[in-house]
């Protein structure tokens, strides 16, 4: 018996079928006094660079909630495995929970295989998870680490796309940080040179983006060591008071004084005794 096939072959190109629906919904919401939610602005500058022997990751430490600085010294460099770390930009809860989940899954993978996890494995786990949620997990990540195949550096976008580059930046201050990388990066840098370059890139994001600020954290990963430098530098130091700004009593002369007595008329008075028994 022949079966009727209901499968419809996919049509190429982008579909705009939902655009008219969204316009109708927006008009209905406007009539009822509702407003559609707007995109939430998040502020961060994270960056990474490949040097001769490993990876240097960097991040600022300012956490914002709208236009308010919620935390001046939060850590944005997350542990994935002993040889892999990840910087997170975007929604703080999403970056924290995503990196914790991938760190646990990567530890199970390492126990199963009996080998040190590779950076490409963490990258694949992260991109598959983020792509599954179609961008609703607001986590923009910079993944870096060193394994048996050498140092690797990835940028991972909230929708699941990834780039493998010798230097990457993410976050609202990424343009300023990328300008520093484009100007001063060179292959096979020494460790101190790479740390200085990443620090300058994060500082550029701090001074040119209101969503980034406070301190600069660095994480240096190589085959022989792991250095977590928190803080590496403090470009925004709080100023000190140069003196007291209080005037002594009697400094300002009183020219005139007028005292008006306050007249109160008692209309009703109730006395309630307290029970002390």
UniProtKB/Swiss-Prot annotation:
Active site: 44
Pfam families named among the record's database cross-references: Pr_beta_C (PF12465), Proteasome (PF00227)
Propeptide: 1-43
Catalytic activity: Cleavage of peptide bonds with very broad specificity
GO MF terms, alphabetically ordered: threonine-type endopeptidase activity
Gene3D superfamilies for this protein: Glutamine Phosphoribosylpyrophosphate, subunit 1, domain 1
Subcellular location: Cytoplasm; Nucleus
GO CC field: cilium; cytosol; nuclear body; nucleoplasm; proteasome core complex; proteasome core complex, beta-subunit complex
EC nos: 3.4.25.1
Keywords, sorted A to Z: Cytoplasm, Hydrolase, Nucleus, Protease, Proteasome, Threonine protease, Zymogen
Family indicated by similarity: Belongs to the peptidase T1B family.
Subunit structure as annotated in this protein's UniProt entry: The 26S proteasome consists of a 20S proteasome core and two 19S regulatory subunits. The 20S proteasome core is a barrel-shaped complex made of 28 subunits that are arranged in four stacked rings. The two outer rings are each formed by seven alpha subunits, and the two inner rings are formed by seven beta subunits. The proteolytic activity is exerted by three beta-subunits PSMB5, PSMB6 and PSMB7.
Function as written in the Swiss-Prot or TrEMBL entry: Component of the 20S core proteasome complex involved in the proteolytic degradation of most intracellular proteins. This complex plays numerous essential roles within the cell by associating with different regulatory particles. Associated with two 19S regulatory particles, forms the 26S proteasome and thus participates in the ATP-dependent degradation of ubiquitinated proteins.
Protein name (record): Proteasome subunit beta type-7
